[in-house]
Amino acid sequence: MTAAMYDLMDYDEVLEKFDPVMGLEVHVELATETKMFSAPSAHFGAEPNSNVDPVSLGLPGALPVVNAKGVEWAIKIGLALNCKIAESSRFARKNYFYPDQPKNYQISQYDEPIAYDGYLDVVLDDGTPWRVEIERAHMEEDTGKLTHLGGADGRIHGATASLVDCNRAGIPLIEIVTKPIEGAGERAPEVARAYVGALRDLVKALGVSDARMDQGSMRCDANVSLRPVGTVEFGTRTETKNINSLKSVEQAVRYEMQRQAQVLEDGGEIVQETRHYQETDGSTSKGRPKETAEDYRYFNDPDLPPVIAPKEWVEEIRATLPELPWIRRARIQKEWGLKDEEMRDLVNAGALDLIVETVEAGASASEARSWWVAYLSQKANESGVELDSLSITPQQVARVAALVKEGKLTNKLARQAVDGVLAGEGDVDEVVAARGLEVVRDDGAIEKAVDEALAANPDIVEKYKAGNTKVTGAIVGAVMKATRGKADPAQVNKLIAEKLA
């Protein structure tokens, strides 16, 4: 039976009958200059198939050479995840055929990973701490990228042709695999989101990856299974592949819990398979049967020697670890005088790093918080994207805040300037100039608009002179309308008060 034959079980009913068990596999592309086993550039965005060589194309006789920086950064990630670092680890060949892997095998690590037995402590939305145990973090190379043409949803099923770009083939990856996450119950989707978010913050703080989920430099595979309440044995799992946002991680886990519960309730069986996440409605769709380790026929790569990590080198790397995110947050919270709830809101919104960068660019903490948590979070929600995927930088937000502080933009005009930047109309100053947004500084023009507004509203003038000074809002509104919102409200209020004195 297929998933499409089933409705979703109500979430509360799922939890009454089943316990969810999760396993999360996160792939992080390392921001090295070159690929993991050869010399081409590892930078994102080049012309298709321009960053390739005999190794990444799998040509006969091509021999891989390990990128030392990739190994160093893998150790750095392992240390930050409280992992044990193997003094000796090995690369293995993971054998399978797919067009995005020209060699017909992927260089990975199997039974001898570079880092193992760690944990990452995360904080849930209400401040509850949760420890996620890490099984392993291992090095491998990324695959190429396929673009399927002619299909209804951009996938291979129904496609009439596929384009292969091998630029990504061979880029260094660290795959971080959790141990089974049990006992989360109704909070399982939230735990998944919190963990992936915390991991993203961590690798960005380490400086080893930009962790752009929207660009594929960080991707999550979510394994989900259910077992009847009160039982111990794990159920059959599915693996939803290549999830590319925090919100999608949460939705995919929740959907699979509800889908699997309904399948089991109706007497069906869960098929061990990969699944695809559908951004349009938060559902998952059937992929391919899930292979076992035996299917990949792992064996040690004969072209690569063991990776030796002496304890002295590991300690040297440990000494280079930067201020880690949870320590940094505690410091920032103290410096900014934020309550625990306020700090959680910033973190949960994905706004903290953006706010810090905006402050570093010259804005005050309150100005930066106001823009990112209020206006820009709303814009991100409207667009259905993560906050850091918006087409505006912290430096641009700081520039808008500076123009407001200088009196060159009102708050309303500033929002229009931000809208222009988000729409791709240029940098802040270019948008302000092109849209003619700068506050009017012509005293004569503003005074004329005030005089006309007063003349058109004699009843308001009478009320003001009778002692009701709060009625000037209509006059200010008329002046702002006449100047297309470009007059300085403080200047307008001052002129009104002077003329009615």
Swiss-Prot record:
<dbReference type="Pfam" id="PF02934">
    <property type="entry name" value="GatB_N"/>
</dbReference>
<dbReference type="Pfam" id="PF02637">
    <property type="entry name" value="GatB_Yqey"/>
</dbReference>
<keyword id="KW-0547">Nucleotide-binding</keyword>
<dbReference type="InterPro" id="IPR006075">
    <property type="entry name" value="Asn/Gln-tRNA_Trfase_suB/E_cat"/>
</dbReference>
<comment type="similarity">
    <text>Belongs to the GatB/GatE family. GatB subfamily.</text>
</comment>
<dbReference type="GO" id="GO:0005524">
    <property type="term" value="F:ATP binding"/>
</dbReference>
<dbReference type="GO" id="GO:0006412">
    <property type="term" value="P:translation"/>
</dbReference>
<dbReference type="InterPro" id="IPR003789">
    <property type="entry name" value="Asn/Gln_tRNA_amidoTrase-B-like"/>
</dbReference>
<keyword id="KW-0067">ATP-binding</keyword>
<comment type="subunit">
    <text>Heterotrimer of A, B and C subunits.</text>
</comment>
<protein>
    <recommendedName>
        <fullName>Aspartyl/glutamyl-tRNA(Asn/Gln) amidotransferase subunit B</fullName>
        <ecNumber>6.3.5.-</ecNumber>
    </recommendedName>
</protein>
<feature type="compositionally biased region" description="Basic and acidic residues">
    <location>
        <begin position="288"/>
        <end position="299"/>
    </location>
</feature>
<dbReference type="InterPro" id="IPR014746">
    <property type="entry name" value="Gln_synth/guanido_kin_cat_dom"/>
</dbReference>
<keyword id="KW-0436">Ligase</keyword>
<dbReference type="InterPro" id="IPR017958">
    <property type="entry name" value="Gln-tRNA_amidoTrfase_suB_CS"/>
</dbReference>
<dbReference type="InterPro" id="IPR023168">
    <property type="entry name" value="GatB_Yqey_C_2"/>
</dbReference>
<dbReference type="GO" id="GO:0070681">
    <property type="term" value="P:glutaminyl-tRNAGln biosynthesis via transamidation"/>
</dbReference>
<feature type="region of interest" description="Disordered">
    <location>
        <begin position="271"/>
        <end position="299"/>
    </location>
</feature>
<comment type="function">
    <text>Allows the formation of correctly charged Asn-tRNA(Asn) or Gln-tRNA(Gln) through the transamidation of misacylated Asp-tRNA(Asn) or Glu-tRNA(Gln) in organisms which lack either or both of asparaginyl-tRNA or glutaminyl-tRNA synthetases. The reaction takes place in the presence of glutamine and ATP through an activated phospho-Asp-tRNA(Asn) or phospho-Glu-tRNA(Gln).</text>
</comment>
<keyword id="KW-0648">Protein biosynthesis</keyword>
<dbReference type="InterPro" id="IPR017959">
    <property type="entry name" value="Asn/Gln-tRNA_amidoTrfase_suB/E"/>
</dbReference>
<dbReference type="InterPro" id="IPR004413">
    <property type="entry name" value="GatB"/>
</dbReference>
<dbReference type="GO" id="GO:0050566">
    <property type="term" value="F:asparaginyl-tRNA synthase (glutamine-hydrolyzing) activity"/>
</dbReference>
<dbReference type="GO" id="GO:0050567">
    <property type="term" value="F:glutaminyl-tRNA synthase (glutamine-hydrolyzing) activity"/>
</dbReference>
<dbReference type="InterPro" id="IPR018027">
    <property type="entry name" value="Asn/Gln_amidotransferase"/>
</dbReference>
